[in-house]
């Protein structure tokens, strides 16, 4: 629920400072069901150029429904082999991909089902999250492994999201660097 909290903080900051911050409409499904998911998408999506569905990565009926509806699935992973194991197994010596990990298998199954029902293809994008410059050696190994997994699991790799102190400090206000010029001194 981090995305929801960030957007809620953003609304509070805009109200407290009396500034107009661009803010998307958003909703949280407290009792997630397929019916409430479709109702919310129809209600909010009618006026939107695109819809972002933020779901926990645990395999559940609502997660499966969200992925089945997606045109693009974005999966953040920490730059660690523990996270990569969820996408696909790597041989400990050669680092060559083996079978899909539990998350990779779930995504593969859902992609196949969507194609079988002629509902289009899900583009899968994996992005390294919380990348710290101090971990250069580990990052090089993770990058190489991700490159091999991307071929085996058919996903695209996006540029990593750096861990920036400034971002962490702005989160409690629901802000980004792009908002700073809108905020009065």
Regions found by a protein language model. Give the residues of each.
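Short, hinge-like loop/turn segments at secondary-structure boundaries
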Residues: 21-23, 92-94, 176-178
């Amino acid at each position: 629920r981090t995305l929801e909290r960030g957007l809620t903080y953003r609304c509070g900051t805009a109200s407290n400072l009396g500034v107009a911050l661009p803010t998307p409409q958003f909703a949280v499904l407290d009792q997630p069901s397929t019916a409430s998911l479709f109702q919310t998408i129809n209600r909010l999506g009618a006026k939107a150029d695109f819809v972002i569905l933020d779901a926990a990565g645990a395999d559940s009926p609502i997660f499966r429904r969200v992925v089945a509806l997606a045109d693009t699935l974005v999966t953040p992973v920490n730059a660690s082999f523990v996270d990569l194991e969820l996408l696909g197994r790597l041989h400990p010596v050669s680092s060559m991909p083996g079978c899909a990990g539990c998350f990779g298998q779930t995504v593969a199954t859902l992609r196949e089902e969507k194609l079988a029902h002629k509902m289009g293809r899900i583009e899968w994008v994996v992005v390294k999250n919380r990348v710290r410059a101090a971990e250069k050696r580990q990052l090089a190994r993770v990058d190489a492994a991700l490159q091999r997994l991307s071929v085996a699991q058919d996903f695209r790799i996006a540029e990593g999201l750096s861990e920036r102190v400034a971002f962490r400090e702005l989160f409690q206000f629901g802000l980004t660097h792009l908002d700073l010029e809108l905020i009065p001194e």
